[in-house]
Structure formats: structure tokens, C-alpha cells
Amino acid sequence: DLLRYIGTMFEVLVFVYENYYAGDSCPEPAHLERKLNAVGFESEEIEDALVWLTGLNTAARGSKGFAGISQLAAPEPWLREPSLTSVRVYPVAERNHLGVECLGFISFLESAGVLPASMREVVIERAMAAPGSPVSLDDLKIIILMVYWSFGQEPDALVLDELCDDTSDRVAH
């Protein structure tokens, strides 16, 4: 259940995700702020979430442009979509803020072919803008859901199950 994030910016993000999954149904920030206030969220949580969502919107728009660059235009090498054999190197700040568990989960999703490089970069950028150091795996999963949402994509059923699964009850075998 996604509503285990009581009292945080992530609770607001989960509410937005669950109630406005069809991205075009999400109201403008001022109207959304009024709705979130009416539901009972704290002003600070709402403001943090709206700032975070604005950053998500900006990052997703920029990434969509990145993914759609025409190869005919011969863009600079750093603007091209990475090759299948390229490896993402994480600077110290990202390694420290994301932590081993989150980096492993991102790698797992990439290896499974469900997190393309353009989305991965938005996930990392938004995770770096999130509170917590390191970011918890549960918070990263919410970030990933929000990135899918911002790209107008729905994760397939198995990915969605993995993102919404509460791993705290799992027993190692």
C-alpha cells in the first residue's frame, strides 16, 4: 500500500499519483495546492511536493527532448542517446545520496529493460532533489512511479507490482 508515507512530501506525491494518474487530469499548481489543503495536507508538505513536481516537469520535458534528438542533425556527442554498451558512472555525491540499495534497484530496472537511460537520468535528478541521505528504497520507488507518470507511461504490471510492494515483510530464504 502506497499510503505508508504519512506526514511527508512523499505522502503528497502518492496522493497526486493515485488521484491524477492520467497526467492531463492534474490541475494547475495553484488549484492543486487548494485541493491538497482541502484534503488536509500540511502547507510545508504541499509546498515541498509542488516544488519537487515542478522540477519533475522540467526534467521530464528536457529528457523527452534529449531522447528525441534527430541523429541527422549530428548533435554533440554528450547530447546523443547512450549506446547499449555504455555504462553510467555515479559521482560521489550521487552514490552517497542514493546509497547502495537504491543504486542496485536502479541497475535492476535498467537490466530488466524497463528503465531507459532518459528516464533513469530523471529518476536520479529527482532523487537528488529529495530529502533523506541516503534516499530510502521506498522513497525511490515513489520517485520512479512519478517519473513514469511524468512521461505519460504506465509501468507494466510486474514493474508496478515491484514498485508498490512493501519489502519490509519479506523473509530471506
What are these regions (language model features)?
Residues 68-119, 169-173:
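Short, amphipathic alpha-helical interaction segments positioned at domain boundaries
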Residues 23-37:
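Short acidic, hydrophobic short linear motifs in intrinsically disordered regions
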Residues 9-23:
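Positively charged, polyanion-binding regions of nucleic-acid-associated proteins
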Residues 1-8:
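Short, Lys/Arg-enriched N-terminal segments with co-localized hydrophobic residues
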Residues 52-64, 115-118:
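A short, conserved structural fragment
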